[in-house]
Amino acid sequence: MNDVAIVKEGWLHKRGEYIKTWRPRYFLLKNDGTFIGYKERPQDVDQRESPLNNFSVAQCQLMKTERPRPNTFIIRCLQWTTVIERTFHVETPEEREEWATAIQTVADGLKRQEEETMDFRSGSPSDNSGAEEMEVSLAKPKHRVTMNEFEYLKLLGKGTFGKVILVKEKATGRYYAMKILKKEVIVAKDEVAHTLTENRVLQNSRHPFLTALKYSFQTHDRLCFVMEYANGGELFFHLSRERVFSEDRARFYGAEIVSALDYLHSEKNVVYRDLKLENLMLDKDGHIKITDFGLCKEGIKDGATMKTFCGTPEYLAPEVLEDNDYGRAVDWWGLGVVMYEMMCGRLPFYNQDHEKLFELILMEEIRFPRTLGPEAKSLLSGLLKKDPTQRLGGGSEDAKEIMQHRFFANIVWQDVYEKKLSPPFKPQVTSETDTRYFDEEFTAQMITITPPDQDDSMECVDSERRPHFPQFSYSASGTA
């Protein structure tokens, strides 16, 4: 492999993801897709070791806009099934053009490299046999899945790029979450985006505590991901009913979450980013399922004040608020917050006023109820360290650090993965179609949410109309 070289460097203004202020950053773009930003221009190798921002432009889509400031450009990527955006601006159109060209050139180069590797792997340089084989090995669907095969029950979430709907598969009576993304968001009008590599990542992901992808398909203007929807209820629901969990019960859930995050970090090189109580569900046996129904929240209006905020602020790690680089350690902060909630019955930092809340997250020392045991205190203190490099799990060992903590001393991690531990609570459901933990308002009566556009029922769009998205239909093998 060639040495990694800097393709372009210079000052950019980067817009904060959560606190929407513009911050000057000195960015380096490298030919391996790394795009890293610093507060000051790095003078030596040591300074280069610790960037504030660390992104990749691989498989990104680039957009230029004159709002909220002139000469703005946005880098958009699909991570997992969630659309992520980074916003920058420069002083002149020429400068923006230079950055855009450099970023596009690097992204295209990486795409070519990946295609060559794919061809090499499938042993055929010219055709799509690699992709075909992949579909076959995943039990190629006997028919194309369409939107008409589901009943639409409830809107679970809505965002800038699409929506998530609770659906029931007519043929089986099983419940799924269908995530529907607008195609135009992901594919630039005049270029083919490199979107579906992520789809492949999802398809190949198998972990007992992660929501599995059951189907993915497309209509003429949407991409649809159909994912498991565990029916043992949200952990949030069970915790609010019981107010607090015992340390043993929290340990069980914590261990399953650690197992799933370890898999994402080490096997998939993905940071989950969105760990919070609402994203944790129980399956019918009482095991954890981490959902992937996340959507970017509605974007703020152009020209809104700097104080505008987007997202769930209570769970944000200090480094995210400061818009510094956040790597895997951000997930361990999230684990700290949800485990604190489970064992203490409240959030570690809370204030209705966002400004005050941010200050607490950044400055306030963590406090514990007197009833909490020393191991639990030690674990939570480690996970909720403000500095991600000092945080438990923040080092190179990642999840292994947490697994070795004395709070988890009696846990056999292979047994966790193999679901050999007995869940401390078994939901009172009789089958996968039992809806007792769903909101009564939508299980009592059949609500029909029409698919996003009436004409979405025109599934069988001929393939010429979807040149951007070859090989998008997917069906998981075996039972869900």
Curated annotation (Swiss-Prot):
The modification N6-acetyllysine is found at K14, K20. Changing Y176F: Significant loss of interaction with TNK2. Loss of membrane localization. Significant reduction in phosphorylation on Ser-473. Its EC number is 2.7.11.1. Keywords: Acetylation, Apoptosis, ATP-binding, Carbohydrate metabolism, Cell membrane, Cytoplasm, Developmental protein, Disulfide bond, Glucose metabolism, Glycogen biosynthesis, Glycogen metabolism, Glycoprotein, Isopeptide bond, Kinase, Membrane, Mitochondrion, Neurogenesis, Nucleotide-binding, Nucleus, Phosphoprotein, Serine/threonine-protein kinase, Sugar transport, Transferase, Translation regulation, Transport, Ubl conjugation. The modification Phosphotyrosine is found at Y176, Y474. Disruption phenotype: Show fetal growth impairment and reduced vascularization in the placenta; majority of pups died within 10 days. The modification Phosphothreonine is found at T308, T448, T450, T479. Binding of the PH domain to phosphatidylinositol 3,4,5-trisphosphate (PI(3,4,5)P3) following phosphatidylinositol 3-kinase alpha (PIK3CA) activity results in its targeting to the plasma membrane. PI(3,4,5)P3 is also required for phosphorylation at Thr-308 and subsequent activation. The PH domain mediates interaction with TNK2 and Tyr-176 is also essential for this interaction. The AGC-kinase C-terminal mediates interaction with THEM4. Belongs to the protein kinase superfamily. AGC Ser/Thr protein kinase family. RAC subfamily. This is RAC-alpha serine/threonine-protein kinase. Disulfide bonds join C60-C77, C296-C310. Glycans are attached at S126, S129, T305, T312, S473. PROSITE patterns: AGC_KINASE_CTER (PS51285), PH_DOMAIN (PS50003), PROTEIN_KINASE_ATP (PS00107), PROTEIN_KINASE_DOM (PS50011), PROTEIN_KINASE_ST (PS00108). One of its GO terms (cellular component) is spindle. Residues 114-137, 450-480 are annotated as: Disordered. Residues 150-408 form the Protein kinase domain. The lineage of its organism: Eukaryota, Metazoa, Chordata, Craniata, Vertebrata. It comes from Mus musculus.
